[in-house]
Amino acid sequence: MLYLEDYLEMIEQLPMDLRDRFTEMREMDLQVQNAMDQLEQRVSEFFMNAKKNKPEWREEQMASIKKDYYKALEDADEKVQLANQIYDLVDRHLRKLDQELAKFKMELEADNAGITEILERRSLELDAPSQPVNNHHAHSHTPVEKRKYNPTSHHTATDHIPEKKFKSEALLSTLTSDASKENTLGCRNNNSTASCNNAYNVNSSQPLASYNIGSLSSGAGAGAITMAAAQAVQATAQMKEGRRTSSLKASYEAFKNNDFQLGKEFSMPRETAGYSSSSALMTTLTQNASSSAADSRSGRKSKNNTKSSSQQSSSSSSSSSSSSLSLCSSSSTVVQEVSQQTTVVPESDSNSQVDWTYDPNEPRYCICNQVSYGEMVGCDNQDCPIEWFHYGCVGLTEAPKGKWFCPQCTAAMKRRGSRHK
């Protein structure tokens, strides 16, 4: 029953052996590279001076160069043999581990039948992550084209997570249509605050679709969505240029990091989301309008203190109406900005919610500096620092034919070409 202790004692010297052999392999690799560089220089000098010297000198130099080439080839073969020895060493230890595990399993089964299956299942449950990490999957059943990048190598597929293909029309159309309905109902009737309030009540009496953005619940109203989008766009604009993204993931992160609390604003049920959401939104609008009006009047001195309450109420209602109209117009502007900046959004069912949780250690790609998802294309420049790009970020809809270079590499090649001219 001391299999683990024996195996640990056996592999105690393995790291040192591997380090010594890898060091020797690196030295041999450098030796071969230096020899090849020197031989290339000798060959170039040989061809430059071949016509000036006698045939005997040419034969002698040719034989010397061949001899040195064979010496470099022998060193390269020795390096390959050393790599094979390292592989055999590690493989031998792995086979030993499998044998010890099989013996240990037989002893456990002899004492308690079926105990190994229970232990293995429990170990798998402990090793499994608490939340699914994979958010985006490409269709694994489709053949991978030459220029397409398959991101499933970076994600572990699970059976209970449906495959999602990201498009911009699904969520964007719902967002803009509901916002345009609200602006039409709430902003055309600009005579008083009551007309705008009635428009919100009419709009909120209809059942609203679920938006499925993280913890965003259904029935929140398009006005609240546009206000949240405004704060998200503002937070995204303040990010560094390399960290901006063309998907709604940055907007969702801005929702979470901003003062606009989604958990409190959108946690109401569908039954009570009709009138309560519209009244809460109208209260927010009137409070903002009254506060702005109070700030604008703070620098003035009141010359007449005997105004009637009806005049004050009418003036406050008119200012509230104008501020509400300005907020409605700004909301529509924000929706347009979001529709321009957004290129990929998830296509999901109305009953499911998108899980935006991803591994922070996962490699980033593309000019948007995001993880791999959907269809990706690779730059044919071997020195490209980014290498892989999302189709939507570089304006592609299908795999390019022939060689393809990213915008950065294309601009760099144009600069080099103009410099040579």
UniProtKB/Swiss-Prot annotation:
Site (Histone H3K4me3 binding): 365, 376, 380, 388
N6-acetyllysine carried by residues: 181, 264
One function term, GO molecular function aspect: histone H4K12 acetyltransferase activity
Keyword Ubl conjugation: yes
Top-level taxon in the UniProt lineage: Eukaryota
PROSITE patterns per record: ZF_PHD_1 (PS01359), ZF_PHD_2 (PS50016)
GO cellular component: NuA4 histone acetyltransferase complex; nucleosome; piccolo histone acetyltransferase complex; Swr1 complex
PHD-type zinc finger locations on the chain: 363-412
Entries under SUPFAM superfamilies matching the protein: FYVE/PHD zinc finger
Cited Pfam families: ING
GO biological process, alphabetically ordered: positive regulation of double-strand break repair via homologous recombination; regulation of cell cycle
Localization: Nucleus
Region (Disordered): 129-164, 286-324
Keyword entries, A-Z: Acetylation, Chromatin regulator, Growth regulation, Isopeptide bond, Metal-binding, Nucleus, Transcription, Transcription regulation, Ubl conjugation, Zinc, Zinc-finger
Residues annotated as binding Zn(2+) 2: 379, 384, 406, 409
Keyword Ubl conjugation: yes
Biased composition (Low complexity): 308-324
Signal peptide residues on this chain, from the entry's feature table: none
Covalent link (Glycyl lysine isopeptide (Lys-Gly) (interchain with G-Cter in SUMO2)) residue numbers: 148, 165, 167, 256
Residues at which Zn(2+) 1 binds: 366, 368, 390, 393
Family of the protein in this entry: Belongs to the ING family.
Quaternary organization: Interacts with H3K4me3 and to a lesser extent with H3K4me2. Component of the NuA4 histone acetyltransferase complex which contains the catalytic subunit KAT5/TIP60 and the subunits EP400, TRRAP/PAF400, BRD8/SMAP, EPC1, DMAP1/DNMAP1, RUVBL1/TIP49, RUVBL2, ING3, actin, ACTL6A/BAF53A, MORF4L1/MRG15, MORF4L2/MRGX, MRGBP, YEATS4/GAS41, VPS72/YL1 and MEAF6. The NuA4 complex interacts with MYC. HTATTIP/TIP60, EPC1, and ING3 together constitute a minimal HAT complex termed Piccolo NuA4. Component of a SWR1-like complex.
Domain notes: The PHD-type zinc finger mediates the binding to H3K4me3.
Chain's role: Component of the NuA4 histone acetyltransferase (HAT) complex which is involved in transcriptional activation of select genes principally by acetylation of nucleosomal histones H4 and H2A. This modification may both alter nucleosome - DNA interactions and promote interaction of the modified histones with other proteins which positively regulate transcription.
UniProt name for this protein: Inhibitor of growth protein 3
Organism for this UniProt entry: Rattus norvegicus (Rat)
Source taxonomy: Eukaryota, Metazoa, Chordata, Craniata, Vertebrata
